Amino acid sequence: MIIRTEHLVKTYKQKGGDRKRVVNDVSVSLTQGEVVGLLGPNGAGKTTTFYMVVGLVRPDEGRVFLDDEDITRLPMYKRARRGIGYLAQESSVFRRLSVADNIKLVMEQNGFSSAQIKARTQVLTEELHLEKFLDKPGGVLSGGERRRAEIARALSTEPAFILLDEPFTGIDPVTIEELQGIIRNLASRGIGILITDHNVDATLSITDRNYILVDAQIIAEGPEQDIRENERVRKFYLGEGYRREGLRGEVPSSASD
């Protein structure tokens, strides 16, 4: 399966009545098993583009497709039923519910049986090392534990894609490394991952491809090294003095590594 956008355009009304084009003719794609970054400076249009893929924002022009189906006007919950999962930047765990009940609630809403819920919960909590947190309410989890619980809940419905909004925000370097390993592991199992994040190094080090937006338009596309060496990207996004030695290193394959 593939998610793709064609020539997305979005404008917003400014003070004084003028309209500003915040996304201008943006086309991106994401296939299953691929990790793709959507990056750029503040105000570049990356978040608006991301939200149009998610279904939170409707484009003024252009279309969003899942394979050959036009899903541009499809609400988020219907996109979810077609296999497009979404993790928001803000905490989305139900704070008073246990980790197990967080997973159970989502699966019940999607028509899974009690037996399926029990089996799937066991698999996910073992995979994401959440066994000892099963009965703990979401409100007492640390940032990294919460992220893993949110991922477990998103995976419970067996999506083909997961769209991650600022997944590396608010967590420490060790937890970032664990999360990177989880993301690469999901991709190796055929799940497509789209990431938008301000943490450039954490994102570029695990992506297969990246789109860089500046002033509402894509100025570059490619793998990590191409992005880091692109003169326009360095000028308008990374900065001329940007340095990072040893481009792609080994990323743990799971949270236990």
Regions found by a protein language model. Give the residues of each.
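The feature captures the beta-strand-to-loop junction immediately N-terminal to the Walker
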Residues: 39-41
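Helix-to-loop junction immediately C-terminal to a conserved catalytic motif
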Residues: 54
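ABC ATPase NBD coupling module
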Residues: 70-85, 90, 114-118, 224-231
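Conserved ABC ATPase "signature" region
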Residues: 115-133, 180-184
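Conserved ABC ATPase signature
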Residues: 137-141, 145
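Conserved catalytic motifs of ABC-family nucleotide-binding domains
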Residues: 158
